[in-house]
């Protein structure tokens, strides 16, 4: 995201924070408004046009969404259109991020939204049929939404369902795995956490997980949430990825390094 878009997003995030608590209905309305804006080239162009005065854009937002969107979501949308966005896609990305953060805020304490997203993403990535169904660019968004409900209703929180519905209905050219990982990162960040994806040959015990999380928290000066991926090809040891940082202590990598040394 460009610097202008990042500054605009930061400003809109402050407005979201000033709302205090938001409910899931408000968060869903914000995401729905983003989909509506993305589905109308004329509306998107008008709201992203830096030559149109903010008060005129406010009027457009109120006229289009005033009857269906509650005031808290309207306040966030007005803050979005007040900003300068580097591209139309980044404006839509900004609304989506704000909506996902609003969903995270709406979750009751202890709701495992981030881990549910991680589990869903892993399930899709290991099922070619699901990946194809969600990744089909010509697929009906409503059919994808129906599939989300069939897979997640009764198995995941309402918050997770709302987020995944958003991702499959407005992918904007992104793959489902990328979408879910990014959403999980936003949910964790909203809770003050950083995600560490830990690949291991066999599952860590609760005690090992706790020690690793504490060690990583000290290293990064931030609370760390572990997501485990079992990969038998690692043979032993583990590989940790936090953002762009990779700590690779797997036996497979050490063996490969030795092979290269003796090649």
Swiss-Prot record:
GO molecular function, a single term: proton-transporting ATP synthase activity, rotational mechanism
A cellular component term, taken from the record's GO annotations: proton-transporting ATP synthase complex
InterPro entries (alphabetical): ATPase_OSCP/d_CS, ATPase_OSCP/dsu
Keyword annotations of the record: ATP synthesis, Cell membrane, CF(1), Hydrogen ion transport, Ion transport, Membrane, Transport
Compartment(s) where it occurs, according to its Swiss-Prot or TrEMBL record: Cell membrane
Pfam families: OSCP
Membrane disposition: Peripheral membrane protein
Keyword ATP-binding part of the UniProt annotation: no
Family stated for the protein in its record: Belongs to the ATPase delta chain family.
Chain's role: F(1)F(0) ATP synthase produces ATP from ADP in the presence of a proton or sodium gradient. F-type ATPases consist of two structural domains, F(1) containing the extramembraneous catalytic core and F(0) containing the membrane proton channel, linked together by a central stalk and a peripheral stalk. During catalysis, ATP synthesis in the catalytic domain of F(1) is coupled via a rotary mechanism of the central stalk subunits to proton translocation.
Complexes and interactors: F-type ATPases have 2 components, F(1) - the catalytic core - and F(0) - the membrane proton channel. F(1) has five subunits: alpha(3), beta(3), gamma(1), delta(1), epsilon(1). F(0) has three main subunits: a(1), b(2) and c(10-14). The alpha and beta chains form an alternating ring which encloses part of the gamma chain. F(1) is attached to F(0) by a central stalk formed by the gamma and epsilon chains, while a peripheral stalk is formed by the delta and b chains.
Xref: PANTHER family: ATP SYNTHASE DELTA CHAIN (PTHR11910)
Name of the protein described by the UniProt record: ATP synthase subunit delta
Species, as recorded: Clavibacter michiganensis subsp. michiganensis (strain NCPPB 382)
Top-level taxonomy: Bacteria, Bacillati, Actinomycetota, Actinomycetes, Micrococcales
């Amino acid at each position: 995201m460009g610097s202008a878009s990042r500054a605009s997003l930061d400003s809109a995030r402050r407005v979201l924070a000033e709302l205090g608590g938001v409910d899931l209905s408000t968060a869903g309305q914000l995401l729905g408004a983003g989909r509506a804006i993305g589905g109308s080239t004329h509306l998107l162009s008008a709201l992203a046009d830096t030559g149109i005065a903010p008060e005129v854009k406010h009027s457009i937002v109120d006229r289009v969404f005033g009857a269906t969107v509650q005031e808290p979501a309207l306040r966030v949308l007005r803050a979005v259109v007040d900003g300068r966005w580097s591209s139309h896609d980044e404006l839509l990305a900004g609304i989506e991020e704000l909506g996902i953060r609003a969903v995270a805020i709406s979750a009751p304490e202890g709701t495992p939204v981030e881990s549910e997203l991680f589990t869903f993403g892993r399930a899709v990535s290991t099922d070619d049929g699901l990946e194809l169904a969600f990744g089909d660019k010509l697929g009906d968004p409503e059919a994808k939404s129906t599939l989300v409900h069939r897979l997640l209703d009764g198995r995941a929180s309402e918050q997770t369902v709302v987020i995944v519905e958003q991702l499959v209905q407005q992918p904007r050219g992104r793959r489902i795995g990328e979408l879910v990982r990014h959403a999980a990162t936003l949910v964790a960040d909203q809770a003050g956490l950083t995600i560490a994806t830990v690949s291991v040959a066999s599952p860590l015990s609760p005690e090992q997980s706790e020690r690793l999380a504490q060690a990583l928290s000290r290293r990064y000066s931030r609370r760390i949430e572990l997501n485990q991926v079992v990969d038998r090809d690692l043979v032993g040891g583990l590989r940790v990825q936090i953002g762009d940082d990779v700590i690779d202590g797997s036996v497979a990598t050490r063996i490969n390094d030795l092979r290269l040394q003796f090649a």
